[in-house]
A protein has these predicted regions:
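Extreme N-terminal leader/targeting segments of oxidoreductases
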Residues: 1-23, 38-42
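C-terminal accessory subdomains/tails of enzymes that are appended
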Residues: 15, 20, 24, 52, ...
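Core beta-strand elements of the Rossmann-like FAD/NAD(P) dinucleotide-binding domain
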Residues: 19-21, 221-231
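Short hydrophobic core segments
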Residues: 26, 227-237
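Glycine-rich Rossmann-fold phosphate-binding loop(s) that bind the pyrophosphate
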Residues: 28-29, 51
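Glycine-rich FAD pyrophosphate-binding loop
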Residues: 40-60
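Dinucleotide-binding Rossmann-like beta1-alpha1 core, especially the glycine-rich loop
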Residues: 64-154
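A conserved short coil-to-beta-strand element within the FAD-binding core of flavoproteins
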Residues: 196-212
Length: 570
């Protein structure tokens, strides 16, 4: 079994200081993780580092959708939509069928003829592009036209005057952070050295001015290290400019930072069997069924504060509530919200920054040379991470070497994907031994895929891990154990934010589960009593800061409230 553990991290750090790599990737979001896998799977000696936890930035704060971007059709971005739909098909069928699941949406229509025809053409093109991208295979159902009554049967809590009918179409959903962690683990399987919380502080250059490595610091120990590499790929998202500035060149990319927020609502609060796709005056709003919850968003506003911890403001939350309530009956209130989160989009910046048009900036990605030996990639979206990764590695290698060592990731299953169908079929039989009901088994299958037997083996070794968390019974104690032993969590907040997601999916942000989760983590990570108490204190401070930030009206005030809880170092 391939693991991200303390031992694996130490081994990777030792390799980083003792050998020269073909490719060094800076950035452990979905783009950087995808690049690390693409390079390693080509047989290139690869290393990947991130200054924070894996998926700590944008890649754990998305709408959790794998989609073609239906709205981009109306901007005539046919190439982008076709590319995204092709990648959606690959994720659903080959790359990560355990993590990516088809999801129906209703598009409510307000005018009986013109809008239905207009929307039907758009969704019809969407379906056609999807069928072309999947080479004729039907990976999701095609659109259906619904009467008002038919739409309200699927979504009973929509206002009667909010529609005259609807179009039902399909996209897909994914646990974004889990996808990133699985990409990193799969890259390690194919030989990559990977270490989170390693901050690059300098780009090294040889006598010809070519990038040849980096200086970095291990934020867990304070140790400095030098990593040598023939090629460096900057995949740091909203930190693109700061990272390329370390090289001191004139090349590189400019990105526009845009904030998007989501609110999380209990599943029972909205009675429906499908999601909603709503067009707004600036963009779109999704109401997405997600496990025991609804995720509703997003917004699109310029962000000028610190990049590490974007937070929703009270105005952001009101915006989402107001737009959702234009169609929901009964309307949502602040009391219905159990969680919120905010992420930053790294959008390619036009020559002249015009913040009022941030929603018009293309999501298509660009790769460029920063200095010889170092390239940067930015733009794109989660769905097209694999294409971005392939393009970045091809660019870094150059045409001749890229042809000699082509990408293989289009048909490469991630860990947990191979044999997923068989394990899904056997899940009930496998779970009977532990007394797990159908909902629990579905949850486990969708998180671990064909690696589910490994989780069961952990429970066999320690039956107490087969019990649910007392304060968060949707998760087993074994899942917390696995987060530390297999999935790379180094701190308590890593577990709550990117592994069990209670930071955004519980009204107290997981506060009631802190003691139990910390106890399990301490046993795996070897914390003494002082470290255990420090970890709990750090996460409680983070909770308090995030809740305080939500009460602020402006980005500046919210950011100031959030940074009261300092980042973990060591």
């Amino acid at each position: 079994m391939t693991v991200l553990s303390q031992e694996q991290r130490a081994t990777s750090l030792e390799a980083m200081t003792s050998q020269k790599f073909d490719v060094l990737v800076i950035g452990g979001g979905v783009t950087g993780a995808g690049i690390a896998l693409d390079a390693a799977a080509r047989g290139l000696n690869t290393a990947v580092v991130d200054a924070q936890d894996w998926a700590a930035g944008t890649s754990s704060r998305s709408s959790r959708l794998v989609h073609g971007g239906l709205r981009y059709l109306y901007n005539l971005d046919f190439k982008l939509v076709a590319e995204a739909l092709r990648e959606r098909s690959r994720l659903l069928t080959t790359i990560a069928p355990h993590l990516v699941e088809a999801q129906p949406f209703l598009w409510p229509l307000k005018t009986p003829v013109i809008e239905r025809a207009y929307s039907a053409v758009g969704v019809g093109m969407y379906d056609a592009l999807a069928r072309i991208g999947s080479r004729g295979r039907k990976t999701v159902p095609i659109q259906r036209h619904l009467s008002k009554a038919g739409a309200m049967r699927r979504f009973p809590e929509i206002k009667r005057d909010a529609l005259v009918g609807a179009i039902e179409f399909y996209d897909a959903r994914v646990d974004d952070a889990r996808l990133v962690i699985t990409l990193i683990r799969t890259a390690v399987k194919y030989g990559a050295a990977a270490a989170s919380r390693v901050k690059v502080t300098e780009i090294l250059k040889d006598g010809r001015g070519r990038a040849c490595g980096v200086k970095a610091v291990d934020l867990e120990t304070g140790n400095e290290l030098t990593i040598e590499a023939d090629r460096i790929i900057n995949a740091t998202g909203v930190w693109t400019e700061q990272t390329q500035d370390l090289a001191g060149g004139t090349g590189g990319l400019k990105v526009l930072t845009s904030k998007g927020i989501h609110i999380v609502i209990p599943r029972e609060r909205i009675k429906a069997t499908t999601g909603l796709f709503l067009r707004t005056e600036k963009s779109v709003l999704f109401i997405i069924p997600w496990q025991h919850y609804w995720v509703i968003g997003t917004t699109d506003t310029a962000w000028h504060e610190q990049l590490e911890h974007p937070v929703p403001t009270s105005e952001d939350i009101d915006y989402v509530l107001d737009h959702a309530n234009e169609v929901l009956d009964p309307p949502l209130t602040r009391d219905d919200i159990i969680g919120t989160y905010a992420g930053l989009r790294p959008l390619l910046q036009p020559k002249v920054l015009d913040e009022s048009k941030s929603t018009k900036v293309s999501r298509e990605h660009t790769v460029t040379e920063v200095i010889p030996g170092m390239v940067a990639i930015a733009g794109g979206k989660l769905t097209t991470y694999r294409v971005m990764a392939e393009d970045a590695v091809n660019f870094a290698l150059g045409e001749s070497l890229a042809k000699a060592r082509p990408s293989v990731t289009a048909q490469l299953p991630l860990l947990g994907a191979e044999g997923f169908d068989a394990v899904e079929n056997q899940a009930h039989r496998l779970g009977v031994k532990y007394g797990f009901d159908a909902d629990r088994l579905q949850h486990l299958v969708r998180r671990y895929g064909s690696e589910l037997p490994d989780l069961f083996a952990t429970i066999d070794e320690d039956p107490s891990l087969g019990k649910p968390l007392e304060a968060a019974p949707q998760f087993l104690r074994a899942e917390v154990h696995r987060a530390c032993a297999v999935e790379g969590a180094l701190h308590l907040e890593d577990i709550f934010v990117a592994r069990v997601r209670l930071n955004s999916e519980a009204r107290d942000r997981g506060g009631a589960a802190i003691d139990e989760v910390a106890e399990i983590a301490a046993a795996v990570l070897g914390w003494d009593e002082a470290r255990l108490e420090q970890e709990k204190s750090n996460y409680r401070k983070r909770i308090a800061a995030e809740l305080a930030a939500e009460e602020q009206a402006t980005d500046a005030a919210a950011s100031a409230a959030r940074v009261v809880a300092e980042d973990i170092v060591g």
